[in-house]
């Protein structure tokens, strides 16, 4: 099965048109497949020994509620989620036969997402701990050691799974907004003059293809994200995106406070 739908120019040259429709089913299968495999693995996993306690000097600097997400970061998360879900529904429902004036809805949600991501980049780079969300060699060394891992082997603010998911969303999200922004030049909007000749046929085909692949990939990512957010053992992390903070006990048993910026009193 061809993963790319091809067309031809008036001169008989083959050009890509968009990602093949059947790839959406592969994305759904991948998302639900990861869900099932992980759920079965966790169900069969035997309880391990209790997590070793953090050193008293280190535990003493951890407050009852540990700040994790600022209000702007939380607002961006939920606003981005609303935009992305709107984009997915307005992209795939018409293809499934649910017809409505989707073009205006789609490009409006896309523009809002572009502005939101631009805000988040500035906010993350200049007002947040920008490096804490990116995977490092230390994350790989401590990955998979379980809850009974020594404190020094535990993650800091973000576990490796969170960092890898964020990296995937960055790649998919930026691909969507860059290609989508270029595609806006092909339709009539109140913001700029329509110019379908900004690129040649082959370039437009590549842009549409990348946009479609990003949208299809987002389907699998959304399924995985909702699944992990709904898991009982992930509730402290999920609730932090609403409340902005995490319980002290969860931090002490699942994270290394020192990597989270906690400095014992004796070292200050």
Model-derived features: positions:
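Membrane-embedded alpha-helical bundles that constitute the cytochrome b-like, heme-associated redox core
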Residues: 1-268
């Amino acid at each position: 099965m061809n993963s790319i739908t091809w067309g031809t120019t008036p001169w008989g040259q083959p050009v890509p048109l968009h990602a093949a429709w059947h790839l959406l089913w592969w994305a759904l299968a991948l998302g639900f497949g990861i869900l099932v495999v992980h759920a079965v693995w966790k169900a069969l996993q035997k309880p391990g020994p209790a997590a070793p306690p953090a050193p008293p000097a280190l535990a003493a600097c951890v407050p009852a509620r540990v700040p994790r997400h600022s209000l702007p970061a939380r607002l961006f998360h939920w606003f981005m989620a609303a935009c992305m879900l709107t984009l997915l529904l307005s992209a795939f429902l018409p293809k499934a036969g649910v017809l409505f004036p989707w073009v205006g809805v789609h490009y409006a949600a896309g523009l809002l997402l572009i502005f939101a991501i631009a805000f988040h980049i500035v906010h993350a780079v200049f007002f947040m701990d920008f490096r804490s969300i990116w995977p490092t060699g230390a994350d790989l060394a401590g990955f998979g050691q379980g809850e009974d891992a020594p404190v020094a082997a535990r993650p800091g603010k973000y576990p490796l799974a969170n960092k890898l998911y964020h990296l995937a969303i960055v790649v998919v999200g930026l691909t969507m907004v860059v290609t989508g922004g270029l595609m806006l030049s092909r339709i009539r909007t109140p913001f700029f003059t329509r110019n379908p000749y900004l690129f040649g046929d082959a370039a437009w085909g590549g842009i549409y293809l990348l946009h479609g692949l990003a949208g299809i990939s987002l389907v699998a990512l959304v399924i995985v994200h909702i699944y992990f957010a709904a898991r009982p053992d992930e509730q402290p992390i999920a609730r932090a995106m609403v409340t902005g903070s995490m319980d002290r006990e969860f931090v002490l048993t699942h994270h290394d406070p020192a990597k989270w910026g906690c400095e014992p009193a004796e070292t200050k």
